[in-house]
């Protein structure tokens, strides 16, 4: 069972929610309410810092990374690392 995130991580998640979906913001210039996507392979725990905010559609929907798969999704929207860098620079 995953541990609850500490207060610092919770604040980072709140900031990500205020930022919105990184794909919607970067590609379409709009705010869309996100959920937290941990970069593939990162999991939880120490690496839980490696996350990007994604709306449902870009996370689990028909245009989502979990639906399309990493290769197709990243070909369309950029790598998760590129989006993380964009998010970190613009939050």
Predicted regions and their residues:
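Acidic/histidine-enriched, beta-strand-rich ligand/metal-binding domains
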Residues: 22, 30-33, 38, 42, ...
């Amino acid at each position: 069972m995953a541990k609850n995130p500490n207060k610092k991580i919770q604040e980072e998640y709140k900031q990500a929610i205020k930022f919105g979906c990184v794909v919607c913001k970067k590609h379409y210039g709009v705010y869309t309410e996100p959920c937290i996507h941990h970069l593939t392979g990162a999991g939880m725990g120490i690496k839980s810092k490696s996350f990007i905010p994604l709306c449902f559609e870009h996370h689990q929907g028909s245009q989502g990374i979990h639906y399309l798969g990493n290769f197709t999704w990243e070909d369309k929207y950029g790598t998760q690392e590129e989006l993380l860098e964009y998010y970190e620079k613009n939050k």
